């Protein structure tokens, strides 16, 4: 069976390139981030990498204190609601929202005035610069709030039915921590034996798919938002798709 890998393209979406070996190959994007002087200001740390495991990078100072405060403020202005999972396709083209007992956080989406806010725009441009993937491939920022004892049990960001959508599936998650948490609230990757501690300005980047088969979920990056024990945790999440997400989404596709 022919295998494929994802090749980073600064000018557009990822390209699928045939390779002769079905072995997992590293994303060129991750190699570029780690090796390029351009990104050293974000202090990229390799937490996991092939061949031992999937790529997992951690950054520091990806967003400033001012930017973090503004995103928290924008989330408060929009209003946080109970987080839900994406459900079944409805006759009107939308998807139902399913409450999940394993997910007790609250969130909102950076749309309308938030989407055009200069700081939100700047943050999304920075993610585009780091990943080399157009902002159009990303869902709107999801702004999250975890209060005491709130959590999100082990899960993957990969959504199978999106394979049949023009957007393709989520291939990458870029998660940013907007504040320090007094206790708890880490992001755990159980299959990698890794837990990332929340810290303002810190970010984590990982793939949801296999490099040699970007249509298939990589279960090794299943992760869990551990319960907040003391304080409140704020975060911002960018889910990046194989192809343009925003245009088909606006068209109801």
Give the ranges of each region predicted by the language model.
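Fe(II)/2-oxoglutarate oxygenase catalytic core
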Residues: 1-205, 209-253
């Amino acid at each position: 069976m022919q295998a494929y890998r994802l090749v980073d393209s600064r000018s557009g979406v990822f390209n699928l390139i045939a390779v002769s070996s079905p072995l997992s190959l590293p994303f060129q994007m991750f190699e570029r981030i780690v090796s390029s002087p351009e990104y050293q200001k974000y202090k990229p740390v390799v937490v996991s990498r092939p061949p031992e495991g999937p790529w997992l990078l951690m950054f520091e100072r990806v967003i400033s204190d001012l930017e973090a405060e503004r995103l928290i403020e924008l989330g408060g202005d929009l209003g946080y609601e109970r987080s839900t999972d994406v459900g079944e396709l409805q006759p009107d083209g939308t998807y139902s929202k399913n409450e999940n007992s394993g997910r007790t956080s609250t969130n909102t989406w950076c749309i309308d005035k938030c989407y055009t806010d200069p700081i939100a725009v700047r943050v999304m441009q920075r993610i585009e610069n780091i990943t080399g993937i157009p902002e159009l491939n990303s869902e709107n920022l999801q702004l999250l709030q975890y209060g005491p004892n709130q959590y999100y049990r082990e899960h993957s960001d990969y959504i199978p039915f999106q394979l049949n959508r023009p957007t393709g599936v989520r291939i990458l998650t870029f998660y940013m921590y907007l504040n320090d948490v007094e206790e708890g609230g880490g992001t755990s990757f159980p299959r990698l034996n890794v837990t990332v501690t929340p810290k303002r300005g810190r970010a984590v980047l990982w793939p949801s798919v296999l490099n040699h088969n970007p249509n298939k979920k990589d279960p090794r990056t299943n992760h869990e938002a551990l319960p907040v024990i003391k304080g409140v945790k704020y975060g911002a999440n960018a889910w990046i798709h194989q192809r343009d997400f925003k245009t088909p989404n606006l068209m109801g596709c």
